Regions:
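Conserved RNP beta-strands of RNA recognition motif
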Residues: 57-61
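Short S/T/G/P-rich N-terminal loop/turn motif that feeds into the first structured element of a domain
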Residues: 1-54, 64-71, 88-114
């Protein structure tokens, strides 16, 4: 996993925060498939994900319309339903517009705020 190389702002970030249920129940396979499928969608910029007890996945999109398009992809809708039924005790989705981004000098964008 690496830090997503995003363009200059503005762009859209979809933040998915979750608490899992016990057991895999096919989660790992579906998670890998969703990451692969998202990368094929128009307007996809990248994704970052981390999980311990609390999982956080941030996907980046060129705009709100691209993010909304991903939400409606048929296979993603199946994953959403399965998540509600079997994988998540709790989750929250937040959609935000990134207006400024900066990082470590050795990262993809340098250290200066943009």
């Amino acid at each position: 996993m690496s830090i997503a190389a995003t363009p200059e702002p503005p762009y859209t970030a979809v933040i998915f925060t979750s608490l899992r249920t016990d057991g895999d129940h096919g989660y790992d396979v579906m998670s890998a498939r969703m990451e692969e499928l998202a990368a094929q969608q128009p307007g996809y910029l990248g994704m970052e994900s981390a999980r311990e007890r609390l999982g956080i996945t941030v996907s980046y999109w060129v705009d709100d319309a691209a993010a909304a398009g991903w939400k409606q992809v048929a296979e993603h809708l199946v994953g959403q339903t399965r998540g509600q039924q079997a994988w998540y005790r709790d989750y929250e989705v937040r959609v935000a517009t990134v207006t400024r981004a900066y990082g470590h000098p050795q990262g993809p964008r340098g250290s200066s705020p943009k």
